[in-house]
Amino acid sequence: MRNQSKQEELVKAFKALLKEEKFSSQGEIVLALQEAGFENINQSKVSRMLTKFGAVRTRNAKMEMVYCLQAELGVPTASSPLKNLVLDVDHNDALVVIHTSPGAAQLIARMLDSLGKSEGILGTIAGDDTVFTTPAPGFSVKRLYHFILVHFNQEL
């Protein structure tokens, strides 16, 4: 089981690195993972992971060719659990930001709005794939963040 959790940690670190959109070669990814404590990582393993997770090379904001994970483009179905539409949850000092599958933000926002102030939600603003949520009076951003993580079964 220890190996399984080490593998999960590797996958989490790998995905986090690709979200940074600054690695232009597999060698750079290998070095970053080694610096993060994954000593046994090599280029062939990184290559397999890039393929497994559907990573592509694209231009970042600085117009550099970098590896990144493709946005989840799966179309939700009527039987898709809402938690599957939530890709990431983060927060700052003012609000909680929820990243969803494309087109799902308004559905997630409407569901959160229906929970109301008693659950800590003052209101939401939704775009296509992003929801901004602000806490109700008496609720901290951190408390709302944890509530949303639990509600959508996201990792703490």
Curated annotation (Swiss-Prot):
Compartments, record wording: Cytoplasm
Example of a GO cellular component annotation carried by this entry: cytoplasm
InterPro entries cross-referenced by the UniProt entry: Arg_repress, Arg_repress_C, Arg_repress_C_sf, Arg_repress_DNA-bd, WH-like_DNA-bd_sf, WH_DNA-bd_sf
Domain of life: Bacteria
Keywords attached to this entry: Amino-acid biosynthesis, Arginine biosynthesis, Cytoplasm, DNA-binding, Repressor, Transcription, Transcription regulation
Keyword Hydrolase: no
Main localization (coarse): cytoplasm
MF-aspect GO terms: arginine binding; DNA binding; DNA-binding transcription factor activity
One protein family per Pfam: Arg_repressor_C
GO biological process: L-arginine biosynthetic process; protein complex oligomerization; regulation of arginine biosynthetic process
Pathway assigned in UniProt: Amino-acid biosynthesis; L-arginine biosynthesis [regulation]
Primary role: Regulates arginine biosynthesis genes.
Family to which this protein belongs: Belongs to the ArgR family.
UniProt protein name: Arginine repressor
Organism this protein belongs to: Sodalis glossinidius (strain morsitans)
Taxonomic path: Bacteria, Pseudomonadati, Pseudomonadota, Gammaproteobacteria, Enterobacterales
